[in-house]
Regions:
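General beta-strand structural signal in soluble alpha/beta enzymes
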Residues: 192-194, 233, 260-263, 315-317
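Iron-sulfur (Fe-S) cluster-binding modules
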Residues: 1-29, 33, 99-108, 156-159, ...
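Short, charged low-complexity linear segments at domain edges
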Residues: 1-12, 41-62, 174-177, 329-330
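Catalytic core of nucleotide-activated saccharide and alditol-phosphate transferases
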Residues: 258-272
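Iron-sulfur-cluster electron-transfer modules
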Residues: 18, 48-241, 245-246, 268-271, ...
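Local cysteine-cluster metal-coordination motifs and their immediate loop/turn environment
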Residues: 18-36, 68-84, 165-170, 196-208, ...
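Short, solvent-exposed polar/charged micro-motifs at secondary-structure junctions
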Residues: 202-204, 271-274, 325-328, 387-390
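A short, structure-level motif marking secondary-structure boundaries and short turns
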Residues: 2-3, 12-13, 62-63, 163-166, ...
Length: 444
């Protein structure tokens, strides 16, 4: 099968990194998941050497395969590399190579389509039962009278930024609405893009289908290049997919970077002095922050933001910070459960009022635990919003705590009817995209 231009450039980038890699093993030495992933006592030099062997068409070693499959995208390896290459990207390409050899393209493509539909159905159903038409329009999912074309810029003008939601935050849309409220308060103009129509391509990349992944990502990238100052991202998975795979590959193809992409929390940093006076209402709360190190600076920005809120006391639970985001640990389910359990117990022992998360994935996985533990589960932006006098309903949490698919569908029957959504489809989504997404079982 003929390679696309994107695939050729992607392969060239991989080859360049392979050539630059000295097999020193420092990336393996700093990785926090070598133990849980089953790397064992293999020498770090041999582990990275096995990864390179796989990328060059070899079989690698059991330890190198385990490391690649268990990668949680923590990112420690990137800073540790003395050659300034990206081991996290090389591990992604290793998983692509393994998938290609193990499964025929037709089956991989079918799997990619199935996974994409699962996300698309989840986004459609779960956003539709929580949002009004105006709110859907505000999030770029429906053109409405309030927000023509999803942009807050004046007619005929380009917005300051494109705010790229990704797909899955639309399942917990109150988080994205708070982000828009904050940008409105700062006087920043933006156009909201996201959802399945602006897919980042990571779903297809995970199946080893670089052709479809590249095509989807490139199409989305070209549409994202509307902001005067770049793109603000919310989803960490989309951010890594674009900044480590798509944008550098497009740059290699076209000779120029189309735009810079900045995570929302890092976008806020230079605006904190303007945001501080808007935080007028005290929020008396002892808060522990669930942390992920995968995108450098995001956790620190979250802590800095919480410290600005009057009345908030930050409690350090002294727990490990691992992975890009919660679902990046899905290949290591027992390890993930142990991390979640230890954090819940530490939060309860510390007497916190709330366990706060930054990312939507963690919110979805954690929120129903509020039923059984003596603290709330909130997103950081909910706390900021409360101090600004803002409030959005947390419909996802309310529904998930019911823990009954039929009761949830019955609760949403009017919204489902208004949006012409089949209750049978809604029930399937509730099971797969809500109730089954519970790494640590409820209860204590």
């Amino acid at each position: 099968m003929t390679e696309t231009a994107f695939e050729t450039a992607l392969a060239a980038r991989t080859s360049d990194m392979i050539d630059a890699c000295t097999r020193c093993g420092k990336c393996v030495e700093v990785c926090p998941v070598t133990g849980p992933a089953g790397v064992g006592d293999a020498a770090p030099q041999d582990v990275i050497g096995g990864v390179i062997d796989i990328l060059q068409g070899g079989e690698g070693t059991a330890a190198s395969l385990a490391w690649a499959k268990g990668c949680a995208l923590s990112g420690d390896c990137i800073e540790a590399c003395p050659e300034a290459i990206n081991p996290r990207f090389l591990l992604a390409m290793t998983r692509v190579a393994v998938a290609r050899r193990a499964v025929e393209l037709r089956e991989r493509r079918k799997t990619g389509i199935e996974h994409f539909r699962l996300v698309a159905d989840g986004v459609k159903v779960l956003s539709s039962v929580q949002l009004t038409d105006d709110e859907l329009a505000r999030l770029g999912q429906k053109v409405g009278a309030r927000l023509a074309n999803g942009s807050t810029a004046k007619e005929g003008e380009r917005p300051d930024f494109v705010f790229y939601t990704g797909c899955n935050v639309l399942k917990t849309p109150h988080i994205a609405l708070y982000a828009l409220d904050i940008m409105d308060a700062l006087g920043v103009t933006y156009k909201v893009m996201g959802g399945p129509n602006h897919c980042c391509g990571v779903i297809q990349l995970r199946t080893g289908d670089t052709e479809v992944s590249g095509r989807q990502a490139t199409s989305s990238l070209d549409r994202l290049a509307e902001g005067k100052t770049g793109v603000i991202s919310w989803c960490p998975s989309c951010h890594v997919q674009f900044t480590e795979t798509t944008i550098p590959t497009i740059e290699k193809m076209r000779g120029a970077r189309p735009f810079e992409m900045t995570p929302f929390m890092l976008f806020l940093k230079p605006h904190l002095d303007r945001l501080r006076p808007l935080l007028t209402r005290p929020v008396a709360m002892r808060v522990a922050l669930h942390r992920h190190p995968g995108i450098k600076g995001v956790t620190e920005a979250g802590i800095e933001l919480l410290r600005m809120v009057p009345g908030v006391e930050i409690v350090d639970l002294d727990q490990p910070a691992v992975g890009l985001v919660g679902n990046a640990l899905n290949a290591l389910p027992e390890y993930k459960r142990s991390l979640h359990r230890a954090e819940r117990e530490a939060a309860a022992a510390a007497g916190v009022d709330a366990l706060a998360v930054i990312y939507h994935v963690d919110y979805r996985e954690f929120c129903a635990h509020e039923r059984d533990w003596p603290f709330r589960v909130v997103n950081v932006l909910e706390i900021v919003g409360a101090s600004m006098g803002l409030d959005h309903a947390t419909g996802f949490k309310r529904l998930k705590i019911m823990q009954d698919a039929d009761a949830i569908v019955a609760d949403c029957k009017d919204m489902l009817a208004a949006r012409n959504i089949d209750p049978a489809l809604a029930r399937e989504v509730v099971l797969k995209a809500m109730l089954n997404e519970q790494p640590l079982p409820l209860g204590r």
